[in-house]
């Protein structure tokens, strides 16, 4: 495989943890966030309607292209329109937790590729800060990962730019789709959390009760 050929089996094993991490974050962290945001039943409601935004983001690699699907999901979940109208467009350009995951992977991969030790608190803190900064530098459009990759290479490996950028761009093509999925799907979860603080703790139950009353009328 690519990573085994370039940097050896140890680095390859570590990099393979990225995909399980994305899956665990999607199926464990998102329900916990939804539970916090809406209480009982919120996580179930989230997963009834999050599939379309997730698939759209995987197919387009664009958080902005996923906004219509996210708006539809937010409406079905019961998120107030005044919340989703603000949070979802902002989240498409600012909410980049998946991109931070992928940036850490890209940085550690390049360290292994160039034979540099990726260890020590200083290295970890620097990598995390650059990962966050590169996530902010990205836009929500398809291919926005190239901007973040350029930031990583220019800050960490400026003298090896000609070699490092093609390598990190290749890795990015493999890891950016799940990162975008977490970014975009997480925008709906973020809207639920904002709704809790704007509408109050029981907003989700009130919305479901209103819908049940209308359905029974």
What does each model-identified segment do?
Residues 1-13:
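Single conserved hydrophobic/aromatic residue that forms the stacking wall/gate
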Residues 21, 25-29, 98, 102, ...:
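Alpha-helical transmembrane segments of multipass membrane proteins
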Residues 14-76:
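Acidic, glycine-rich loop-and-beta core segments that form the ion-binding/anion-interacting portion
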Residues 10, 17, 48, 122-126:
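Alpha-helical transmembrane segments of integral membrane proteins
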Residues 7, 104-217:
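Transmembrane alpha-helical segments and their short flanking loops
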């Amino acid at each position: 495989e690519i990573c085994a050929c370039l940097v050896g089996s140890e680095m390859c094993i570590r990099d393979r943890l990225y995909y399980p991490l994305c899956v665990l974050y999607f199926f464990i962290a998102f329900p916990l966030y939804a539970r916090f945001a809406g209480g009982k039943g919120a996580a179930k409601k989230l997963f009834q309607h999050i599939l379309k935004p997730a698939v759209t983001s995987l197919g387009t690699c664009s958080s902005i292209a996923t906004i219509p699907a996210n708006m539809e999901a937010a409406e079905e979940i019961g998120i107030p329109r005044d919340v989703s109208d603000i949070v979802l467009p902002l989240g498409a350009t600012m909410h980049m937790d998946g991109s931070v995951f992928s940036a850490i992977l890209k940085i550690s991969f390049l360290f292994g590729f160039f034979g540099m030790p990726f260890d020590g608190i200083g290295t970890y803190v620097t990598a995390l800060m650059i990962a966050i900064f590169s996530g902010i530098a990205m836009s929500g459009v398809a291919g926005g990962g190239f901007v973040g990759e350029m930031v990583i290479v220019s800050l960490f490996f400026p003298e090896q730019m000609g070699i490092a950028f093609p390598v990190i761009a290749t890795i990015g093509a493999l890891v950016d789709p799940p990162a975008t999925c977490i970014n975009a799907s997480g925008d709906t979860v973020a809207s639920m959390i904002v709704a809790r603080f704007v509408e109050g703790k029981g907003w989700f139950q009130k919305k479901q009760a209103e819908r049940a009353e209308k359905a029974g009328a």
